[in-house]
């Protein structure tokens, strides 16, 4: 259940980022995971959910990747949601994540790749 919950948090977070932010997120993936570079270049916001869902390990490391991107508020929200045990059902986790993370991404500056 925890794995599914982390997956929902990651995918919800990726739904709420711009294409520029997604490009920066992708810059950290080759260092952390064994993902073909060709797949990363074709990854866009519409395919991110399906492709990243297939890569084992991404969900367990999203917090660290968001910290590298200087998205400290987002990383903190993800940790808080996990620690408070809101992972009862995927739909409740998704609705909480959307309300908290939707505002957190836009306007946060980070290091460019």
UniProtKB/Swiss-Prot annotation:
Function: Functions as an inhibitor of DNA virus-induced activation of AIM2-like receptors (ALR) inflammasome through interaction with AIM2.
Induction details: Up-regulated in response to IFNB1 or virus infection.
Domain of life: Eukaryota
Domain Pyrin: 1-52
The keyword rRNA-binding appears for this protein: no
Name of the protein this chain belongs to: Pyrin domain-containing protein 5
Segments forming a coiled coil: none
């Amino acid at each position: 259940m925890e794995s599914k919950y982390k997956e929902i948090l990651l995918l919800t977070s990726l739904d709420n980022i711009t294409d520029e932010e997604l490009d920066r997120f992708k810059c950290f993936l080759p260092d952390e995971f064994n993902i073909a570079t060709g797949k990363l270049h074709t990854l866009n916001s519409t395919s991110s959910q399906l492709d990243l869902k297939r890569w084992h390990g991404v969900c367990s490391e999203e917090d660290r990747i968001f910290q590298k991107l200087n998205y400290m508020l987002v990383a903190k929200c993800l940790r808080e949601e996990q620690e408070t045990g809101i992972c009862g059902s995927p739909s409740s986790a998704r609705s909480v994540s959307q309300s908290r993370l939707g505002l957190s991404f836009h306007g946060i500056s980070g290091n460019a790749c």
